[in-house]
Amino acid sequence: MAISLGRVVVPSCTISGDRLFIPNFSAICSVSCGRINVGTGVISARRRRDIGGVLISSCLSTDSSSSPPSSSSGPKTKLYVSGLSFRTTEDTLRDTFEQFGNLIHMNMVMDKVANRPKGFAFLRYETEEEAMKAIQGMHGKFLDGRVIFVEEAKTRSDMSRAKPRRDFPKPQSKPRTFRTW
């Protein structure tokens, strides 16, 4: 799908739910404050948004003649990376994982209080093949002195269906007796 951003036309992008995904700018912009008119293919937003240096005006027009890329919309292109060192930066992570393919989005989760990474990140590749190469190439490998784990990211619905943690039996309470001397 092509989108016109003022004077700039982005040839391939995806609209998923309330998010506008533009791989050329490696950014995701929420358009939840606007509305999507499917009949005319017009997305109108009430506010201006900055995506990779391009300011989206109050009206975005879409070209519905071209279809969105199916490879980037699948959940198998999103990876979960855990075990990251607190010293790992976004640049280090990007440089490490770009060798496996076109990395179109990266979210290193930060601890806002301590102002450092929490030790995990989410990555999105353009195709499933690139994501699988990244899993095979980096799962169990060292990055900044720590072993990292790379796997397909689970959706929230998968997490809610997961088997709950085993409940341990509560200790039986006995009446306490205190000795008085």
Swiss-Prot record:
CDD domains: RRM_SF. Gene3D superfamilies: 3.30.70.330. Keywords: Chloroplast, mRNA processing, Plastid, RNA-binding, Transit peptide. Coiled coil: none annotated. Residues 155-169 have a biased composition (Basic and acidic residues). GO terms for cellular component: chloroplast. Residues 77-155 form the RRM domain. The keyword Oxidoreductase does not apply. Residues 1-44 form a transit peptide. GO terms for biological process: chloroplast mRNA modification; cytidine to uridine editing; mRNA processing. It is found in: Plastid, Chloroplast. The keyword Ubl conjugation does not apply. It holds the Pfam family RRM_1. SUPFAM superfamilies: RNA-binding domain, RBD (SSF54928). This is Organelle RRM domain-containing protein 6, chloroplastic. It comes from Arabidopsis thaliana. The gene is ORRM6.
